């Protein structure tokens, strides 16, 4: 699936999907066929890390 390329827009998109549709990042990545490591690195590049307890990037 195509996901936003811009990191700031990607952050909003992923957090919304996590909040509304997925129990965790692993399920989101499997369902959307997204490389979890690449996604995590891209969002880390703008200062956001995944918090599994809150199921969101912060």
Predicted region positions:
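N-terminal acidic leader/helix
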Residues: 1-20, 24
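Short alpha-helical "recognition helix" segments of helix-turn-helix
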Residues: 28-29
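Short acidic, Pro/Gly- and aromatic-enriched capping/linker segments at domain boundaries
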Residues: 34-49
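Short, acidic, Ser/Thr-enriched surface-loop or helix-capping motifs
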Residues: 52
């Amino acid at each position: 699936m195509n996901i936003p390329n811009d990191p700031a827009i990607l952050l909003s998109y992923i957090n919304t999907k996590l909040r509304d549709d997925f129990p965790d990042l692993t399920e989101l990545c499997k369902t959307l066929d997204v490389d979890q490591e690449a996604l995590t690195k891209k969002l880390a590049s703008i200062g956001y890390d995944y918090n599994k307890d809150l199921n969101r990037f912060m």
